[in-house]
């Protein structure tokens, strides 16, 4: 069953381009926007991640942290971030989880458990309260 409004989000640790990330440790007492994207180097995802980077200072003023994921590797993320920064005139410095094993995507319902092993995560967004509940 997928996560629903009001559910406590499960904690996880996963690799990112910034090193290992533990969700609860990363979140602390902040709100968190966790969003997934299907794949690195896609035009729509490039503009979305660039826009999140541009808005991030405003979100931080409101105690909101951002984190994203895809089933690509941390090395792929690092290369793609250079493209995002160049084409979107911004600096992506928030974590992009490298969910190549699909563990977090499946845990959060971003990929159906019976989906093909080649299927990527769908675009999905969770806004989580400081209490770790989905709103």
What are the residue ranges of the model-derived segments?
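Single conserved hydrophobic/aromatic residue that forms the stacking wall/gate
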Residues: 126-135
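Chalcogenol-based redox active-site neighborhoods
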Residues: 1-127
């Amino acid at each position: 069953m997928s996560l629903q409004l009001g559910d406590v989000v499960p904690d996880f640790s996963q690799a990112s381009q910034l090193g290992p990330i533990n969700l609860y440790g990363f979140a602390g007492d902040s709100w968190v926007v966790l969003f997934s994207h299907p794949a690195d180097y896609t035009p729509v995802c490039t503009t979305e991640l660039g826009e999140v980077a541009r808005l991030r200072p405003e979100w931080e003023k409101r105690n909101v942290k951002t984190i994203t994921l895809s089933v690509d590797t941390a090395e792929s993320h690092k290369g793609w971030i250079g493209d995002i920064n160049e084409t979107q005139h911004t600096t992506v410095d928030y974590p992009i989880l490298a969910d190549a094993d699909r563990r977090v995507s499946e845990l959060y319902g971003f990929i159906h458990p019976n989906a093909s092993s080649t299927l990527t995560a769908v675009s999905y967004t969770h806004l989580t309260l400081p209490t770790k509940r989905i709103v």
